[in-house]
């Protein structure tokens, strides 16, 4: 048991201690060291350690050997991890002869390399799952050009966390001989992992009371300094990297250093703050997505109603066109019937005349058949006494006004299409081609939405110069008609011109009751007393109190909060109710 304890205090298990210790010239271990095959034990720790000290001292550079092997007045043996598990080929260790050997994958943490995020290690309890190791769905960036990410920070290396997590499931006990059991804890002092059976001395023995136990660690080399091979127990706040106690007196001398526990607590506080900020952003995005989902439904409902109105109006238009078509058709049929009746009358008259002529012809044929000359002459004289030449046939010309109907309908169709296209284009330019979704620029100075409410209503620009055209639209008396008036004269703001313009704009003509307009002394005085307004005019706002924007303090803006924000709501940006009388809180 004492031998086992001594081996644990030396940082390795009995099985892990092999013939890698430096030997003398004869190839055998000094001071009573026995060698049996490949494995050997040091019977005299002092002699063996002295020999190893010589070999290590020869490999170190001048000036480093003493600082590396001595701390104060006590000589310390460098802790070297020998892996006896199946991963021996992949183990990383330093050669006692050349100090080169296999390099640690964490060699980038040494001084002189580029600064990287600090390597963190698992503490007591379960290994923390990295928040960056989970798979993320691709997201659409909504960050505007020119903006900077407030929560931008270097991403941690997920490989270390994934290796630690996957390795903890396969770490084997370093003290088991033969069939190795699964390790349940790892000791940072012993630099070894133990199963439940071999962990009892650490739990029950007083000599191991100060040993720090953690969840099974697969690679102890990751906790060692790549320069000195010592356990990294300090954190350099200047270079933001883990160091050993030798680095504190050499490469990181005069740097601000703390223990890894203190640095971990500080980083955990920073991480908690970042998580809080991310949670607030998540809540904000969820609320914004919920709002836009409602806007999406509202847009669909609005479009459905507009489509119904479109269908109804065009259905009415088509019905009216069909009605007009039927009326034109009925007119054409009526005109046809009238013309046919007139032709029938003419044809009846012609038939009657033809009948009379046929009768005259038969009479003459009978007269021609008389053989008696006296009788023939008597009958012929009686016939010719009443005979007259038949009148000529009347001439008729049918005026078909419908011969130009095709051209008229073509012109009508072109005119109708032009009117439809003009109105449709007007509607499209007014509504369909407008950008319905605009970003709020309140953070850039000024509530542009508040300005747009007036510009959309009055057709003016808030940034227009201080001219009468800008302010006359707000001077409309109650019951009057709003009129925008702007004189063309450059000197329109002199005393006489201003009064004349206002008399023309708000005169006493019509049904409007006369009103005496009172002007301030700043306008009634001489021109030199007129205050100069920054801009393109010398218009005085003091003369018209109704033009002055209210300087009273604004009411406290209402806030729009979600039920998800019972905590940390003071970080939530509020939506401002602009006081437009509707009472709804609009989102940016």
Curated annotation (Swiss-Prot):
Its main location: cytoplasm. One of its GO terms (biological process) is innate immune response. The keyword Zinc applies. The modification Phosphothreonine is found at residue 476. Residues 259-352 form a coiled coil. SMART domains: BBOX. It is found in: Cytoplasm; Lysosome. PANTHER family: B-BOX DOMAIN CONTAINING, TRIPARTITE MOTIF-CONTAINING PROTEIN 29. This is Tripartite motif-containing protein 29.
């Amino acid at each position: 048991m004492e031998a086992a304890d001594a081996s644990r205090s030396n940082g390795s298990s009995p099985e892990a201690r092999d013939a890698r210790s430096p030997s003398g010239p004869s190839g055998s271990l000094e001071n009573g060291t026995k060698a049996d095959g490949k494995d050997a034990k040091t019977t005299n720790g002092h002699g063996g350690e002295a020999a190893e000290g010589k070999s290590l001292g020869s490999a170190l550079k001048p000036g480093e050997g003493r600082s590396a092997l001595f701390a104060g007045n006590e000589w310390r043996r460098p802790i070297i991890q020998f892996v006896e598990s199946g991963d021996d080929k992949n183990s990383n260790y330093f050669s006692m002869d050349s100090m080169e050997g296999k390099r640690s994958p964490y060699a980038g943490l040494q001084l002189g390399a580029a600064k990287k995020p600090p390597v963190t290690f698992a503490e007591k309890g379960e290994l923390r799952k990295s928040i960056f190791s989970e798979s993320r769905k691709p997201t659409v960036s909504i960050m505007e050009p020119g903006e900077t990410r407030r929560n931008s920070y270097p991403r941690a290396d997920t490989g270390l966390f994934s290796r630690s997590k996957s390795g903890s499931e396969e770490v084997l006990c370093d003290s088991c001989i033969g069939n190795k059991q699964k390790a349940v804890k790892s000791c940072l002092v012993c630099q070894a992992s133990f199963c439940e059976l071999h962990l009892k001395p650490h739990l029950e023995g007083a000599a191991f009371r100060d040993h720090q136990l953690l969840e099974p660690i697969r690679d102890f080399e990751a906790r060692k300094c790549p320069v000195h091979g010592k356990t990294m127990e300090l954190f350099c706040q200047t270079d933001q990297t883990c160091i050993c106690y030798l680095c504190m007196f050499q490469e990181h001398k005069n740097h601000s250093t703390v223990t890894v526990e203190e640095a971990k607590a500080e980083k955990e506080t920073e991480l908690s703050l970042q998580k809080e900020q991310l949670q607030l952003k998540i809540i904000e995005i969820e609320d914004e997505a919920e709002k836009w989902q409602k806007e999406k439904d509202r847009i669909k409902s609005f479009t459905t109603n507009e489509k119904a109105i479109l269908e109804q109006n065009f259905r009415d238009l088509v019905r009216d066109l069909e009605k007009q078509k039927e009326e034109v058709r009925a007119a054409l049929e009526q005109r046809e019937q009238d013309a046919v009746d007139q032709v029938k009358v003419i044809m009846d008259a012609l038939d009657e005349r033809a009948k009379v002529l046929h009768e005259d012809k038969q009479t003459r044929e009978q007269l021609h058949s008389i053989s008696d000359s006296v009788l023939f002459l008597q009958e012929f004289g009686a016939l010719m006494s009443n005979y007259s030449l038949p009148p000529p046939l009347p001439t008729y010309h049918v005026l078909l006004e419908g011969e130009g109907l095709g051209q008229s309908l073509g012109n009508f169709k072109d005119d109708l299409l032009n009117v439809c296209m003009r109105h449709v284009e007007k509607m499209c330019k007014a509504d369909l081609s407008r950008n319905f979704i605009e970003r709020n620029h309140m953070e850039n100075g000024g509530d542009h939405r508040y300005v747009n409410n007036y510009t959309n209503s009055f057709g003016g620009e808030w940034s227009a110069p201080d001219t009468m055209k800008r302010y006359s639209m707000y001077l409309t008396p109650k019951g009057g008609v709003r009129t925008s008036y702007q004189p063309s004269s450059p000197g329109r703001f002199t005393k006489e011109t201003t009064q004349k313009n206002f008399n023309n704009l708000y005169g006493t003509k019509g049904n409007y009751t006369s009103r005496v307009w009172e002007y301030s002394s700043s306008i009634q005085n001489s021109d030199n007393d007129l205050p100069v307004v920054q801009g393109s005019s010398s218009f005085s706002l003091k003369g018209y109190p109704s033009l002055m924007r209210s300087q009273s303090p604004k009411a406290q803006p209402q806030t729009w909060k979600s039920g998800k924000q019972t905590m940390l709501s003071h970080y939530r940006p509020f939506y401002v109710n602009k006081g437009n009388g509707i009472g709804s809180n609009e989102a940016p």
